């Protein structure tokens, strides 16, 4: 879990406003991504299912409570004039916070693990161990979609390393990639 400061939240008319987000980097629950139709131009159906698993709602509520405690502690407490959401946060029970998390959880837009990598005999594996697509010559994938699990941190650094590794493999073994 992490606590993120969001300086761009609520800045329509009040530049002194900021937000704090409680972030659950690893979830027990999972969503689903499905094709809406055979038409490649139709947007896929995305079902996030945030906090559907009670363990996720409980953990995110705990992080939310920690975020609130952070706001009320030390130097930051003297700078906070008002908390706009949730109203009256000190009086919310753990159950109330979990319900709040279920209703208002959203994505940080770091999807990963959507393209399976595996052995040639795995019918669900789209990519081989080099990142080459089994069904389209000349296509390699080098991003967060090939991660087998969601990392417990922001996906940026991990994605950069995947790109570096596949880029180096391309340089050293170009024939493997059809070059």
Label every PLM stretch briefly:
Residues 1-158, 166-179:
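FAD-dependent oxidoreductase catalytic-site/capping-region signature
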């Amino acid at each position: 879990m992490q606590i993120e400061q969001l300086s761009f939240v609520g800045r329509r008319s009040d530049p002194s406003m900021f937000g704090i987000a409680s972030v659950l980097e690893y979830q027990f629950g999972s969503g689903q991504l499905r094709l809406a139709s055979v038409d490649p131009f139709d947007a896929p159906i995305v079902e996030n299912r945030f906090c559907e698993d009670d363990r996720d709602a409980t953990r995110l509520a705990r992080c939310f409570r920690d975020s609130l405690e952070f706001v009320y502690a030390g130097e930051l407490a003297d700078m906070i004039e008002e908390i706009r959401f949730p109203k009256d946060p000190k009086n919310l029970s753990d159950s109330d916070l979990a319900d709040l998390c279920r209703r208002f959880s959203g994505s940080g837009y770091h999807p990963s693990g959507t393209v399976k990598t595996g052995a040639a005999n795995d019918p669900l594996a789209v990519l081989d161990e080099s990142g080459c697509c089994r069904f389209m010559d000349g296509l390699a994938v080098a991003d967060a979609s090939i991660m087998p699990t969601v990392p417990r941190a922001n996906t940026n650094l991990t994605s950069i390393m995947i790109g570096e590794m596949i880029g180096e493999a391309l340089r050293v073994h170009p024939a493997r990639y059809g070059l």
